[in-house]
Amino acid sequence: MRTEPDRKSSYGRSMTQTQQAQKILVTGATGTVGRQVVAELLARGHTVRALTRDPATADFPAGVEVVRGDLTDPDSLVPALVGVTGVHLITFGGAYFAPLETGPRILELARAAGVRRVTVLHGGEATPLEQAVRADGRVDWTVIMPVEFMGNALEWADGIVTAGEVREPFVSRLSAMVHEGDIGAVAAVALTEEGHGSQEYVITGPELLTVGDKVATIAAARGRDIALVELTEEEAVAQWRAAGHPEDVIGFLLEAYGNTPEVGRTVADTVEKVTGRPARTFGQWAAEHADTFRAG
């Protein structure tokens, strides 16, 4: 059941006021969300151990302990789990990011290592790992359920820089898109503070935006107008195929854009309740990435 954080708890307080530094294992640490979880934990004074299949190519901030491991091979996680109090888990793994079938074993190893808290990044479906975590009564679990990432707008960068335009279908669709840093912040609090066990946290931004709103915001941030070209479904499919998207991804995009679920177009105040500060706006995100949308 989705729940809202308790307003009476100590969310948003600094670590020094509420607890000692903890050691947290972050899986998917090189991913969009994982990197934000790492950064937020470090900012809060915790020790971070980052799991990756190839430590030699991983690039993390100073102070992060990088360890080798593969979620599709649970026993490879045993050294990484030693001494950690919490684990941030993704539910997909391997070269093709298939749903992890190893979830029950991963959870078993985490419990045996003394892990007290886990966060699970929801991937749009109930995977074996998420199901195992939800069914377990021996660790405090929090399912992190973000809506559309603000970072998805980076897919427009090439078209904006080269042609000064964005070509999209369903331009009136609404989205409560979320800053990835806010996802990381919520996960970091849930991993290190009391009161977040057995919770589902839907994480959104603070506003509803159309495609036109997003384009106008990016234009303001980069200081130059951007044309918005609305595509028909057929034109969009052709564009996605030309970009190399598989047919199942194209089907997903058509459904997600043409029939956005209510949860994706409803603003939730989870970020502020959990972290003690408002969710970041798309304007803030656009300002952070303005140079990406500028030529040269």
Segments and roles (model prediction):
Residues 2, 10, 16-62, 72-84, ...:
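Oxidoreductase cofactor-interface core, primarily capturing Rossmann-like NAD(P)-dependent enzymes
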Residues 4-12, 233-296:
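A hydrophobic C-terminal alpha-helical subdomain
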Residues 69:
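Cofactor-binding loops of NAD(P)H-dependent oxidoreductases
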